[in-house]
């Protein structure tokens, strides 16, 4: 009988390696989260993930993780890293419960990690500077000075392609993020880099000289990454993603962060002109925008963006319809506000700010931010009556009349007789407010981004980068070279600059 305890000890010693993974789950991750009341998330500090906004932290992944923590009934804490390698290392060391960092699902890592549901699709793209080197395929890329983030998915892909093209070389940098490498390309310090299409779609609006040459892989999927042992947390993630897809919360986040990008073609000339005028014209009126912003509780960047859409910051602007000034006020509006001179910048800016504030105030209380602001901008452009018609039409079509993403679908219908004949205010060029809001949001995003970069002391593209580089006319764009992702062969197709796909939702 005395031998049994000894046998039990020996048996445990033999089985310990086998049971190791189960013993490591003695305190599952979900229990740890509930005990501490904190969900620890590792992310990347970037425009597509997590960044310091005007008065709070923002970012698609930040908001998504914050919503998930609220679903669990706990607080959220973020660990900021720069590269994919650092993010995964943090996860591997057990310092975070999950990674919400815009990471691509890597099936070959399935033995190390669990992945949440896919929520976005991207492509890796070769990005260079307009007027610089013009690689049209993988062979020609070997002649460029190529830099990528060290131990990133981009470097993994280059290693694969190097098996096809041995002369392909690159420099891997462990001090810069992908966004910072894109800036180096824009500054002319690096010829080309690789970046995901969603990252390119946002960043080329800040750096318009960035140009996409060709994609180098098939569609990839973004998903949250969790430690292999986080089985119960993974189940919560899957269940919750299904919920936010059904209740529209995921759509709302995409609208917030990509609504001004989705479906919008990139206008290089307009973007470049806007950034140029940020240094040439904006300084003369910035203090007026800030003054009106404080008075009417509207971000000055939004007012400035709207003014640019109205007049390109020209205080003497006028149109054939009779609107005039930097905010293009009508005579009726100016008279109602007691404005004698619509060409006076201060009067015009304050008048426009009051009018936008009034539109926002008059909207139903069921419309919340940020939709309230986007719909108010549409009302500024087309009139509150037509917005009311569009909201009623949205209800008839089982759409949400309080959500801008739904209203922008029905507004263009107001130009069709079968729809406007039954409305109170009749015909409207409904596509105009849709374009108007998209452009204002686009300019607002650039202004906000540039202000943030000024605040943090980063380089800001207010001045022309590397003016020695010649500008290439749009009509002289190179032939696109693509790699067939199935067999690695190069495919050449004639055409314009490679398009940057809009960020694609994965559902």
Curated annotation (Swiss-Prot):
One biological process term from GO is: cell wall organization
Which GO molecular function annotations are given, in alphabetical order? peptidoglycan lytic transglycosylase activity
* SMART domains listed in its UniProt record: PBPb
Q: Give me the ranges of the annotated region Non-LT domain.
A: 21-261
| GO CC annotations, alphabetized | cell outer membrane
Report the catalytic activity.
Answer: Exolytic cleavage of the (1->4)-beta-glycosidic linkage between N-acetylmuramic acid (MurNAc) and N-acetylglucosamine (GlcNAc) residues in peptidoglycan, from either the reducing or the non-reducing ends of the peptidoglycan chains, with concomitant formation of a 1,6-anhydrobond in the MurNAc residue
- Give the EC number: 4.2.2.n1
Domain of life, per UniProt, equals Bacteria
Q: Where is this region: LT domain?
A: 264-507
Active-site residues, Swiss-Prot/TrEMBL: 310
Record's keyword terms, sorted: Cell outer membrane, Cell wall biogenesis/degradation, Lyase, Membrane, Signal
Keyword Transferase annotated:
no
How does this chain sit within the bilayer?
Peripheral membrane protein
Q: Which PANTHER family match?
A: MEMBRANE-BOUND LYTIC MUREIN TRANSGLYCOSYLASE F
Q: Which family does it belong to?
A: In the N-terminal section; belongs to the bacterial solute-binding protein 3 family. In the C-terminal section; belongs to the transglycosylase Slt family.
What does the record say about domains? The N-terminal domain does not have lytic activity and probably modulates enzymatic activity. The C-terminal domain is the catalytic active domain.
Primary role: Murein-degrading enzyme that degrades murein glycan strands and insoluble, high-molecular weight murein sacculi, with the concomitant formation of a 1,6-anhydromuramoyl product. Lytic transglycosylases (LTs) play an integral role in the metabolism of the peptidoglycan (PG) sacculus. Their lytic action creates space within the PG sacculus to allow for its expansion as well as for the insertion of various structures such as secretion systems and flagella.
The protein here is known as Membrane-bound lytic murein transglycosylase F
Q: Which organism is it from?
A: Magnetococcus marinus (strain ATCC BAA-1437 / JCM 17883 / MC-1)
């Amino acid at each position: 009988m005395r031998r049994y305890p000894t046998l039990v000890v020996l048996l445990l010693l033999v089985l310990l390696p086998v049971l190791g993974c189960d013993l490591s789950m003695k305190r599952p991750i979900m229990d740890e989260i509930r005990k501490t009341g904190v969900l620890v998330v590792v992310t990347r500090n970037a425009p597509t993930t997590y960044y310091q906004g005007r008065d709070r932290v923002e970012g698609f992944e930040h908001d998504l993780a914050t919503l998930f923590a609220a679903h669990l009934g706990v607080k959220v804490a973020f660990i900021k890293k720069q590269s994919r390698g650092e993010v995964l290392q943090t996860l591997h060391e057990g310092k975070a419960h999950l990674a919400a960092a815009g990471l691509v699902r890597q099936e070959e890592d399935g033995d190390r990690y669990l992945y949440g549901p896919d929520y976005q699709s991207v492509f890796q793209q070769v990005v260079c500077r307009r007027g610089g080197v013009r690689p049209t395929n993988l062979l020609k890329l070997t002649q460029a000075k190529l830099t990528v983030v060290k131990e990133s998915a981009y470097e993994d892909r280059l290693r694969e392609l190097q098996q096809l093209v041995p002369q392909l070389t690159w420099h891997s940098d462990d001090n810069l993020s992908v966004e910072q490498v894109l800036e180096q390309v824009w500054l002319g310090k690096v010829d080309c880099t690789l970046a995901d299409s969603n990252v390119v779609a946002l960043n080329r609006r800040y750096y318009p000289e960035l140009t996409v040459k060709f994609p180098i892989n098939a569609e990839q999927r973004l998903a949250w990454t969790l430690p292999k042992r986080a089985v119960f947390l993974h189940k919560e993630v899957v269940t919750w993603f299904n919920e936010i897809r059904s209740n529209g919360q995921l759509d709302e986040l995409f609208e917030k962060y990509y609504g001004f990008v989705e479906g919008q073609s990139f206008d290089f000339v307009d973007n470049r002109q806007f950034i140029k005028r940020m240094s040439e014209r904006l300084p003369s009126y910035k203090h007026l925008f800030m003054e009106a912003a404080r008075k009417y509780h509207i971000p000055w960047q939004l007012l400035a963006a709207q003014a640019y859409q109205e007049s390109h910051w020209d205080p003497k602007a006028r149109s054939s319809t009779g609107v005039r000034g930097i905010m293009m006020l009508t005579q009726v509006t100016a008279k109602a506000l007691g404005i004698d001179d619509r060409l006076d910048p201060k009067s015009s800016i304050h008048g426009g700010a009051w009018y936008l504030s009034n539109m926002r105030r008059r909207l139903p209380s069921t419309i919340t931010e940020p939709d309230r602001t986007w719909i108010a901008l549409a009302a500024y452009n087309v009139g509150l009556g037509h917005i009311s018609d569009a909201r009623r039409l949205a209800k008839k079509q089982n759409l949400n009349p309080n959500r801008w993403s739904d209203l922008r679908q029905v507004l263009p219908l107001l130009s069709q007789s079968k729809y406007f004949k039954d409305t109170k205010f009749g015909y409207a060029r409904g596509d105009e407010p849709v374009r108007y809001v998209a452009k204002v949001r686009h300019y607002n995003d650039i202004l906000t981004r540039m202000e943030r970069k000024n605040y943090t002391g980063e380089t800001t593209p207010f001045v022309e980068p590397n003016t020695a580089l010649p500008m290439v006319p749009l009509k002289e764009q190179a032939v696109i070279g693509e790699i067939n992702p199935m067999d690695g062969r190069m495919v050449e197709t004639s055409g314009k600059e490679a398009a940057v796909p809009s960020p694609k939702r994965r559902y």
